[in-house]
Amino acid sequence: QFSADSVFHWARSSAWCDSTHVLHYQISTPQGRKFVSYDADKDEMKTYDSQKTMEKALGIKPRPAYKPQFGRRHERHWMEVDEEKEAYPVLSPDGKMEAYIEGYNVVVHEAGKPYTEAKRILTQDGTIGCYYSNRIQWSPDGKYIFVCKRVPVEKRYAYYVESSPADQLQPILHKQEYAKPGDALPQHYPVIIDVTTGKKVEADKHQIENQYELEWMQWTPDSKEVTMEYNQRGHHLYQMLAMNAETGKLRTVVEERANTFVNYGRLWRQFIKDGKQLLWMSERDNWNHLYLYDVQKSKVIRQITKGDWFVRGIQRVDEENGEIYFSASGVNRNEDPYLVHYYKIGIDGKNMVALTPEEGNHSAQYTYDYRYLLDTYSKVDAAPVTVLRDAQTGKLVK
């Protein structure tokens, strides 16, 4: 079993200094730890007698100490569902107006003026059983507001007893919000409001019925549409939808269907070309791969990665040079298929480069500009090895 304290002479706690090609790390030895920095551009290495000395020499600001909060008044269960009712204001792009929820409805107000003055109520149909969510989004041009009507449901709880609390003799009954199979879930129905005229358009509820989630709302740069992702309960259907700001009509940009379930936790997306194209990750061919979409035509332009292997994650999309940096497993046939390697590939699906070719499970740290790559790799039967690579070619630098 690997133990970081019993394996010596490997780089640990490594990191790049901000906006530089200077690396700092520690080396464990039988005599203690060594503190080292390395300038990749100058091929210059320096050692220090302590962590504090190294941080001072390199201008590294020490991390603030974590201060845990104790006592029951600080407790909060992470499974509590946000009711989206808090009335905090959302500023318009030009900073002149702010929108917020008041009495279940959407209100706009001139920024900087008293809240009793210069406000305009944009909606009047919000109720306790179907109110406007506080997750308000202004369009980039400030003309529209996107918001959802939220239909809440009765909260369901799981109860458990803390039999021996540390600060009292009596047991404590806890409850945790927990929706069980078949329980009703909150529903969200999109609305777009013209701030000047007050005209509002609503999406067709039948296109987004039986929601598990409706999330990832985002305006397009031209303020013509709002994209969102609809996860139907049961996870057999997952769609990226686009809502027209003038008509409220929903159209499907991307659709994922599965007889078993769509692994929505693996999905990843990024708009490029000013929102005209979309990078999308999907398991639709039974392997997790990247696809390029034409957003307006709702069509796949190409599958970027393909094969009997799977993409693990995306580190960077270099739109200027048309490249994607990603991690993957299973590319090398004669290896354990779960070992992680790092690659780059063109958005055109060509010129895939293995940046970490050695057999092993790799962990990569790139410089801010992706000029260098610090690569640490190991296996269950091999101690960690750390090398410096050219992040464009994968060639060893040191």
Model-derived regions: residue spans:
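Beta-strand C-termini and the immediately following turn/loop, strongest in propeller blades
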Residues: 24-29, 95-104, 110-111, 146-152, ...
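Beta-strand-rich domains and repeat architectures in extracellular enzymes and scaffolds
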Residues: 2-33, 85-91, 213-215
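Residue-level detector of Asp-centered blade-edge/turn motifs that repeat once per structural unit
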Residues: 18-19, 93-94, 140-141, 221-222, ...
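Short glycine-/Asp-/Thr-/Trp-enriched loop segments that recur within the blades
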Residues: 4-8, 56-61, 82-83, 126-133, ...
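Beta-propeller domains
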Residues: 153, 157, 165-300, 312
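A short beta-strand motif characteristic of beta-propeller blades
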Residues: 2-4, 76-79, 120, 124, ...
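Predominantly five- to eight-bladed beta-propeller fold
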Residues: 41-78, 119-137, 147-205, 394-398
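Short loop/turn segments that connect beta-strands within beta-propeller blades
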Residues: 40-41, 111-114, 195-198, 245-248, ...
